[in-house]
Amino acid sequence: MKTIPKKTIWYPIQFILLIGLIAFLSFYKLDVKYVDPWDEARHGVNAYEMANGGSLIQSTYMRQADYYNLKPPLSMYGIMLGMAIFGNTVFALRFYAALSYVLLALCVGLFAKRYGKLESLLAVAFLAVNTTAFQAHMIRSGDADSLYVLLFTLAMICMMKIRENGRYSYACAFLFALAFLTKSYHAGLIAVIGGLFLLLTGELKKWKAKNWLLFLAAALLPIMLWAAARYRIDGMTFFQKMW
């Protein structure tokens, strides 16, 4: 009978324990802290009204067009998902943000394993002890930041794998679009880093017209579809204020 080496046993156990620790830190008493009266509360109202007879494209506050929260609606869909599962509660408001961080830790840990098991565990451990992320406006808050950081990180992971498989450039572009639909112009950082990477590594020289077409479609089509739908509602008003 074959025995499993101890090193093979310990890595998955330690990895699962670290992910479990992050899940505990993210979700434990998630609904205890008061709701921030600024962004968090407003995002909750936006999502609630969207889910209860409002527009899925235009965010509203007190059933009036909201030009204070000038973000595209993807993060509001995350809050709506929480409300659909857990009802209209504070836990539901923050659920998607906490889940995003757990998924972030899982993805980072699995990606880092290519460099070694110790590196994988250290990467997840760092995310567990990064106290700043557990404070206001991110993991334990109904704000867009946690989802944005997840999408940003996935885009960077895909970018680092482009030289292995060029199709990862399309995934990176699509994640840029999702990040834009979450935090608007914050996603520009992905474009800057990705553009420099493609330029400095010489990957752009390998691209043909088909590659450019697919890349631009992945990056721009989701944004353009949302923008067209939003334009039909209130013209250029939202975009002018957003700018």
Model segments located where?
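Transmembrane-helix signature of polytopic, membrane-embedded enzymes
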Residues: L18, V108-N130
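Membrane-interface transmembrane helices that cradle and orient dolichyl/undecaprenyl
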Residues: K2, R114, T153-S169
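Membrane-interface alpha helices of multi-pass inner-membrane proteins
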Residues: C158, Y168-K183
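Loop-to-helix entry region of an early transmembrane alpha helix in multi-pass inner-membrane enzymes
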Residues: P73-Y77, F86-L103, M138
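Short acidic/glycine- and proline-prone juxtamembrane loop motifs at membrane-interface regions
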Residues: H137-L147
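Extracytosolic helix-loop segments that constitute the early lumenal/periplasmic catalytic or substrate-binding loops
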Residues: F24-K29, H43-Y67, L74
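Transmembrane-helix motifs of polytopic, lipid-linked glycan transferases
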Residues: F95-K117, L154
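Transmembrane-lumen/periplasm boundary regions of multi-pass, lipid-linked membrane glycan transferases
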Residues: H43-E49, I162, L178, T182, ...
